């Protein structure tokens, strides 16, 4: 439920910033109605995205057949991402339990060293991606879609498809960099903790050697 609130809060903020409702000739109520249908569909809270909204005073289906087909692919990708996230969490917990049992006292030291090595490599990789997205987001986003989808249903027409007007490049650019920022904050925070722990251990070891 918290994730739903977070998603909707972000969408509403971006809609206000981009003046989406005004540019499309929709009320905020209908704009949120269409968005809720998409988000609920992604999270398996509904079976389709069939909703009716008023666009420039005319009642119409919010999304056509092509958009509905594309959302099937998007939901599949979303579910795959959630599976990867859950597997990563399970592997992390399993690794920590293994180290706790086998390495005991040295667990935190080994974990900190390995995490810092991995974090540095990951930081370089994601910094390159972020740099690419910052310099040419359109090329970055197009490449992502070509890699993520096996068809061209993601190529929507702004003259006929509401979805691409709801979520223009500026919308996704903000979303991508916000996600990167959230992950970076977590990575950097844990990196600093690992660094401080290792420095403490080195000072402790140095003190013991000096005492001897």
Language-model-detected regions and their locations in the chain:
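Alpha-helical transmembrane signal-anchor/signal-peptide segments
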Residues: 7-24, 145-146
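Juxtamembrane interface at the cytosolic side of transmembrane helices
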Residues: 89-137, 189-212
């Amino acid at each position: 439920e918290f994730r739903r609130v977070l998603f909707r809060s972000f969408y509403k903020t971006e809609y206000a910033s981009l003046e989406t409702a005004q540019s499309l000739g929709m009320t905020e109520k209908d704009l949120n109605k269409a968005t809720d249908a998409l988000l609920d569909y992604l999270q398996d809270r509904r079976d389709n995205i069939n909703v009716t909204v008023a666009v420039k005073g005319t009642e119409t289906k919010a999304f056509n057949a092509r958009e509905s087909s594309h959302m099937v692919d998007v939901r599949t990708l979303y579910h795959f991402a959630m599976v990867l996230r859950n597997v990563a969490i399970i592997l992390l917990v399993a690794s920590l339990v293994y180290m706790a049992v086998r390495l005991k006292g040295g667990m935190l030291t080994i974990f900190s060293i390995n995490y810092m090595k991995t974090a540095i490599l990951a930081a370089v990789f994601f910094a390159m991606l972020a740099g690419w997205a910052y310099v040419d987001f359109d090329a970055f986003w197009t490449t992502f879609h070509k890699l993520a989808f096996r068809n061209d249903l993601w190529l929507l027409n702004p003259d006929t498809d509401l979805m691409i007007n709801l979520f223009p490049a500026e919308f996704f650019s903000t979303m991508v960099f916000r996600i990167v920022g959230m992950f970076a904050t977590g990575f950097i925070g844990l990196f600093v903790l690992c660094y401080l722990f290792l420095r403490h251990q080195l000072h402790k070891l140095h003190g013991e050697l000096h005492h001897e």
